[in-house]
Design a protein with these regions (language model features):
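A short glycine-rich, Lys/Arg-flanked "PGG" loop and its adjoining helix->strand segment in the class I
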Residues: 161-178
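Short, glycine-/aromatic-enriched active-site segment of Class I SAM-dependent methyltransferases
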Residues: 183-200
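Short beta-strand element of Class I
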Residues: 33, 106-111
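Conserved class I S-adenosyl-L-methionine
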Residues: 82-92
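S-adenosyl-L-methionine
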Residues: 109-162
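Conserved SAM-binding loop of SAM-dependent methyltransferases across substrates and taxa
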Residues: 93-104
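Flexible, glycine-/basic-rich loop-and-beta segments that form/coincide
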Residues: 237-271
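A basic, amphipathic helix-loop patch mediating RNA/tRNA/ribosome contacts
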Residues: 1-51, 85-86
Length: 271
C-alpha cells in the first residue's frame, strides 16, 4: 500500500541493512544496493517492508568510511589507543569512534552538533557517551568532566582555528590528537571552486601551514602529516595532522609540499 512506502535509505536502517541513513546513502552511491533485483540509484526511492532490499558490496570494518581515515592515522603515526579515554569531535555516524574502540579505547565521548546520526551499534555501546546537539567550540568540563588521552576532529563548515583552543584544556598533558584538515573549510571563499572543491595544491599547502600555526597557538606541537585515504563527499583531498599537547609547542617541519604532492599524485592515478 502507498501509505506504507518509505524512502529506501530510511527503510535500509529500519531493516538493519545499514547502520544509519548517511551510511545507507553511501551504500546506494556505491551502486551495490538492489531493490527487488534492480540497482538503486537514488536514496529517495520509495519502497516497502515487503520489498527485497540487498547490499552486495564488501562488508566494511567501520560504521562509516570515516573509520578508514583514522585507521590510516593509527597505522602511519603508530598510535596505540589501548585503554585510552578519547574524544571524537564531529562524530556524525561514528566512524572515528568505531575505529577508536576497535583499537582498544576504553571510553569515547562522541560529540556532534547534530542529532540522530550516531550509529545504533555505537549508541548502545556502554563505552560511548553520545554528546549530540553539542557545539564543541563552546564545550566545557561539564560535558566532558575527565581529561582525555586522545582526540580526533573531523568537522565541517568551521575552521580548526576555532576547535583547537577548545580541545587543548580537555586533553591531558602529553595527550595527542589527529585532526582532519579540510581545505574547503579553511581556504576562504575566494579559493573554493565549483561544488565547494579546492583543487589548487598551492592553496592546500597554505591551508595546512595555517592549521599548523593554529595548533601551536593552541598549545600543541605538530608531530606528523599525511593525506586521508578517501576524499571528502564532493571530491576534496583532505589531510591528517598529528598533534601532541606538550609543554614546548613546536612544528617539527613536516614536508607539507611533499605530502600535498603525494596526495595529488595518488588520487590522480586512481582517476
Amino acid at each position: 500500500m502507498e501509505e506504507n512506502r518509505k524512502r529506501i535509505d530510511a527503510l535500509m536502517v529500519s531493516l538493519g541493512v545499514a547502520p544509519s541513513r548517511e551510511k545507507a546513502k553511501e551504500m546506494i552511491k556505491s551502486g551495490n544496493v538492489y531493490l527487488n533485483g534492480k540497482v538503486v540509484s537514488k536514496a529517495g526511492l520509495l519502497a516497502s517492508d515487503c520489498d527485497i532490499i540487498e547490499y552486495k558490496g564488501e562488508s566494511e570494518r567501520y560504521v562509516s568510511r570515516g573509520g578508514l581515515k583514522l585507521e590510516k592515522a593509527v597505522e602511519v603515526f603508530k598510535l596505540d589507543l589501548s585503554g585510552y579515554l578519547c574524544i571524537d569531535i564531529g562524530a556524525s555516524t561514528g566512524g572515528f569512534t568505531d575505529c577508536m574502540l576497535q583499537n582498544g579505547a576504553k571510553k569515547v565521548y562522541a560529540v556532534d552538533s547534530g542529532s540522530g546520526q550516531l550509529s545504533p551499534k555505537l549508541k548502545s555501546d556502554h563505552r560511548v557517551i553520545d554528546l549530540k546537539k553539542t557545539n564543541f567550540r563552546y564545550i566545557t568540563e561539564k560535558e566532558i568532566p575527565e581529561r582525555a588521552d586522545f582526540a580526533s576532529a573531523d568537522v565541517s563548515f568551521i575552521s580548526l582555528k576555532y576547535i583547537l583552543p577548545a580541545l587543548s584544556p580537555l586533553l591531558k598533558d602529553g595527550g595527542s590528537a589527529v585532526c582532519l584538515i579540510k581545505p574547503q573549510f579553511e581556504a576562504g571563499r575566494e579559493n573554493v571552486g565549483k561544488k565547494g572543491v579546492v583543487k589548487d595544491p598551492r592553496v592546500h599547502i597554505k591551508v595546512i601551514k595555517n592549521v599548523c600555526s593554529y595548533a601551536v597557538q593552541a598549545g600543541f606541537s605538530v608531530s606528523a602529516l599525511d593525506f586521508s585515504p578517501v576524499k571528502g563527499p564532493e571530491g576534496n583531498i583532505e589531510y591528517l595532522v598529528y598533534l601532541k599537547k606538550d609543554e614546548v609547542q613546536s612544528v617539527s617541519a613536516p614536508d607539507v609540499a611533499g605530502v600535498v604532492s603525494a596526495a595529488h599524485a595518488c588520487f590522480k592515478a586512481g582517476e
